[in-house]
């Protein structure tokens, strides 16, 4: 696989109407599986696994397109095909209904980001400082989103002219990156030759002189700041940190965890309607609703677990049956986008600290709350496993694998999963090394025996979507939420609600013998000629519960060691041994892990970090009070 990167200048970053139009147009072109470029190049022609896009703030913005997962021999063709499609789109009437959907969706997402993302305002202020007018008038545009009302009135001709001016007919630069074994070997040999020549040029005396110079620089850099100076700026108390406070309430099976006594719980009790579904509510001051449905994988057969990546990719990108009629996936995605701010199916680790689980997530406006529950049921039970859609999903997964295999950090964690987890682990089944083998076989089987693959997927569906395997979390302003419990009735209609609730499986229950005794396998070295840096991951046993009394002390210790200009920073990053290093606590798997990120010599970075930790253990290094206060 090769790389393509395309860049062109865009409109003035200080023009809110032009910037809003650019965001909307990029969404129209490549924002989802039904957008023009994604639908043609990814879903239908299978030329790429995705079409990435973004823009950088400059006086003239810079627009970027990046098709990923492109076969090396097709790089030039795909680059040309992208512009052929863009010119074709600009030459014909646009789908103005979908364009209007994109305008409204962009506005919803902007409102959502303004509420939920700290960087939204920070980036706006920074961009105003760098590029805005000196009188501060540019920043006032942040106080309104009226530009989207204007865009709703734009005509087809205006949109097409904008597309031609800034994208389809604009001057651009295309970079095509072709992998080359010869160049990799040549670069390595050239670097070795350069170092040897430099050593010879300096000689023993020159090297010794440079070593002394380096030693003097390190000594100067390591001069400690007097404690009396640091004490002039006391660390603020934790009470000065303003958290978003939430009030919990529960319904159905969630009450087995306890029933809170508060006003929000009374609201839920009034609308519970004897619904047995496990529902956890978190009441916060928000204008939106965050919905997560957590699914366990304990009932998924071992042989079906490697199907999970395909199942998850296909979940929202497949036809459904409604009232006896087949609704094609393009219409499904279009309707989903009309009703939501965002949606996805992802691993439970990222969403709910349940790595072995699967999570369905939605962010919506309160008035769409009930509609989303209907969507969840429709995608669970009314979706159709379509051969064409499955083939497209497999093509995307396979196209992404070479890029993942060129990523040192990604491969490090993939190898870690292969060593420390057993065959029944969903995390292991979804990792790159399993996908690389299984998906190729699955693609061949789908071509020869499609009914076999479809039957496997149906079995997987039935093992996931059962009443006793569902847990739902709703984060919203519950007091203003219409029918907070009643809205979930359609989801469990017709389900067997008598079966006992299935417990969630912790990753520590899916460990291999080597996972139970980390270190017994020994050191694993994975040569990767595609990268210049090295990466390292070291695992040891750790707490297996988030309520373990050692957790607070462990958190403070890690925070202390990892502080900017702290012990690890100075010993590893400060001396050029790695771009980054740090500890990770994983109570779900029962590990404490230390990682080194982008190092010229990962072992030296590990040894330096080890020496730092040991110096605090044996008392050679002292814990500075102000540093501990900052860590807390």
Region roles according to the model:
Residues 1-15, 34-253, 331-510, 576-632:
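Charge-rich, well-structured scaffold segments of protease-associated domains
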Residues 21-32, 82-87, 556-563, 609-614:
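Bilobed periplasmic-binding protein/Venus flytrap-like ligand-binding cleft at the lobe interface
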Residues 199, 489, 493-554:
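Prokaryote-biased recognition of long, low-complexity C-terminal linker/tail segments
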